[in-house]
Structure formats: C-alpha cells, structure tokens
Amino acid sequence: GAGYIGAHVVRLLRQRGDRVVVVDDLSTSNAARIGDTPLVRLDVATDEARSVLSNLMVDEDVTAVIHFSARKQVGESVARPTWYYQQNIGGMANVLAAMEDAGVDQMIFSSSAAVYGIPTAEVVTEDMAGHPINPYGETKLIGEWMMADCERAWDLKWIGLRYFNVAGAGWPDLADPAIMNLIPMVLDRIERGESAKIFGTDYDTPDGTCVRDYIHVLDLAGAHIAALDVLAEGRQPDHHTYNVGTGLGTSVREIIDGLRRVIGWDFPVE
C-alpha cells in the first residue's frame, strides 16, 4: 500500500473520500508516500500476520482488500525460489485466511502478465495463462488459483489484475524509485553521468530491441478502483482476471528516444 502502485491507489481512494488502512512492512516502500493514511507496519508472510490482520479487519470494519504485497524481481525469484514462495504464497495465504476469519469477502489482487510466460500469440488473452517461466510468475498464477479455491469454499468475491509494464507517475512524490525498471534505470544512469545501455539488439522486432506493453500507473490505479467498485456494488464481473495494459508494444529504443525528446538532450546510448 505504500509502494509505487499502491500509493497511487491509496491517494485516488482518499481523494474520493474512501476510508483506507494500509498494511506494509516498508521493506521496499516509504511511509511518506501515503501521508497521514493509517499505517500498520507488518510483514504479511510472518506467522503472526493472520491474527493481526483479522483483528485489524474487524476493528476497522474493513469491507474489501486490495492485495499488492509481493516480491517481484524475476531474476531474484530464480535465484531464491523457496523464499519467493514463502513470501508471495505464504503472505497470500495469511491474507485470505484473515479475510475468512474476519468475514471480509472482497479482494482485488495484484497479478501479473508473467502468468503467460513466453506466449506464441502477438496479443495475449486472459484464457492463455498457465505457462509462467519463473517462480515470480508462478506465485502470481498460484495466487489466482487460491482465490478461486476460496470462492468455492467460502464465496470470496475477487478480481485479479494482470499488470503489464507500469511506468510514469501521477504525482512527482509518487514516482517509481526502483532502478530495476527501464525508465528509472535510464534516468539513474544519466544522473550519474553514464551512458544509457541497451541489452539486446537482435530481437525479432522492427528495431531489434525488446518490445513491451507499457501502461501509465494512474491508468493502472484507476483499474483497481473500477474493479473494487464492481465488487462493492455486488455486480458479477464478466471475468475474474483482466489484462491491464494498452495492447500496444513499445521497444526499448523507442522508450529511450522518447526520453531524449522529453528531456531535450540527446544523451549517449550504448
């Protein structure tokens, strides 16, 4: 809730008058991002998390949960698979169990396009999931399975949003600080007086660089709120999982050229 995407959702919810409580261990986030929004500092993957969360949900009259908490670096997930399962699946299990204990039956889940692995189609549809190629993507797919199981067991109402590549900032103080992502990485190298670096120029794409679907973080935040409203109003969604992207691909070189135009400087690229 205090991370890059979560903080945008929190701000939009509060702007429209919703009451919000954030649970975050602040290991990869910053409390300053959520201002005076009530914050409970907690790692949801710990043994005590279930009871703490269920008591909090009862005390705060929580009606819905938006679950962002997860480790999300693909390379790290390959190097530390059991830790990723403990963090992402263990945390998800604690949150769902706490919701059942507290009688909270609405969840919006931060899923990922990583559930598709390496698709053979140019445009992926929601029914093509099931072939992740790394532990991170596997944990997201399992998270969707867990919600479906809880729907069958105790009538959980849920929507999973499969993010593509998130970029931008709705407000300057909520910009993405994670230099593992393309745009912050390029800006960080420029700030340090280094050349931007392109890794891979022989992809089967028009300019040889990797192509990804990028979505602005405010559009993604709005998708969370729209999904939340569907569940709050008791409407039956057409699907449980939704791709959240633009459907348009942008290459690494196009991103760098765009940054050059915006900055007004033809910075060096390797």
Language model: regions and residue ranges:
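N-terminal Rossmann-like NAD(P)+-binding domain of SDR-like oxidoreductases, especially those catalyzing
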Residues: 1-166
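Short capping/connector residues at structural and topological boundaries
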Residues: 31, 79, 121, 129, ...
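Short, flexible, glycine-rich and Lys/Arg-enriched loop motifs at helix boundaries
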Residues: 31, 160, 165-182, 192-212
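Short, amphipathic alpha-helical "lid/cap" segments that border enzyme active or binding sites
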Residues: 50, 54, 183, 217-225
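Short-chain dehydrogenase/reductase
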Residues: 85, 133-141, 176-184, 213-214, ...
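Basic phosphate/pyrophosphate-binding loop/patch that engages nucleotide-derived ligands
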Residues: 100, 149-152, 182-191
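C-terminal substrate-binding subdomain of Rossmann-fold SDR/epimerase-dehydratase oxidoreductases
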Residues: 190-270
